[in-house]
């Protein structure tokens, strides 16, 4: 059955436009409450990032859950992985995150975690969608859910993050820049690294409701690179608005993406005898990652794009390390979902145990030039089915002669066609990507 509301990462859109409106979000809270109340514990955690619309949507969700008879535990600004972790430790029936991740402030979204801290199964999302088609009916007054705020959520999560860094190691003597993108990690990430001994220069830690992901954070790592060079820091880390993505910068200002982070973590796990199986990447993962892991004898598999699909494949194979080149890194030995802070701590562990700078650790992987072009399209159209597009793709693949890849896919969160071409020569793949993008544009 086709989904009406849930995309690859929950419900998302522009604030004030359906479905990100107060009335719909209240009904979504009610529908989720109706489904979840059948499963046991009648309490749900709610966290949010720093968007100004989070206040409005939090109140709407709270009202909907209360109408269904569930208790809402409000945590305020909290990274997505923190909600996943705290949902488990509070033994709640579910966790809800109000965030649009790396998108601008005027977007927002709602995503859910199940009691075990993983994304909701498809069948539960479909059950919530089915309830949304029914009229909202409030439970009896005596059965209404209450709401309460907890003040120590950030402290609990800080201690959890620190626990994923070996107790016999220290970040003493390390100078690092931490860019929180004016997002949900602003009051957490700097404390984690400072308390482990690092000298921290914090940027992107002054959210005003409108500046999330604006020229800072993992989607704009140039700001981090500039600060690392300016301060002569050893490295830098940048998170997105909800803290589930990580991008790093070494002391030369080189920007290290999710594929290179996966390589560093996997190589360290292999070296220390902790690697279980292989590594799961996505269809967008750089060929350089696959070849570098192959050289180390580490198996590599590609899942569909989206951290939920990476996690599904990791569980199917019993592997513990996976992620996306965008910086979603999942370390199942430590947590249940993508966690930017925890992933950064795994890289810092590798730096400490190998006694090598970040620049040296990443040098074992040589990335292929990869060009991504986004083409906006009208909803309801399918330009990927056009003969001209398919012919151009076939032509490009023939020219690459097995030393590169072409990938076209629809975004799961925006009306975009993503055209990716990868090969050995940057100008060649840039030209190829533009040729295909032009055919996609012409198709509608």
UniProtKB/Swiss-Prot annotation:
Database matches in Gene3D superfamilies: Alpha-D-Glucose-1,6-Bisphosphate, subunit A, domain 3 (3.40.120.10), Alpha-D-phosphohexomutase, C-terminal domain (3.30.310.50)
Gene name of the record: glmM
The family this protein is said to belong to: Belongs to the phosphohexose mutase family.
GO terms classed as biological process: carbohydrate metabolic process; peptidoglycan biosynthetic process; UDP-N-acetylglucosamine biosynthetic process
Keyword Phosphoprotein: yes
This protein's GO CC annotations: cytosol
EC number per UniProt: 5.4.2.10
Organism whose genome encodes this protein: Aeromonas hydrophila subsp. hydrophila (strain ATCC 7966 / DSM 30187 / BCRC 13018 / CCUG 14551 / JCM 1027 / KCTC 2358 / NCIMB 9240 / NCTC 8049)
Record's protein name: Phosphoglucosamine mutase
Classification via InterPro entries: A-D-PHexomutase_a/b/a-I, A-D-PHexomutase_a/b/a-I/II/III, A-D-PHexomutase_a/b/a-II, A-D-PHexomutase_a/b/a-III, A-D-PHexomutase_C, A-D-PHexomutase_C_sf, A-D-PHexomutase_CS, Alpha-D-phosphohexomutase_SF
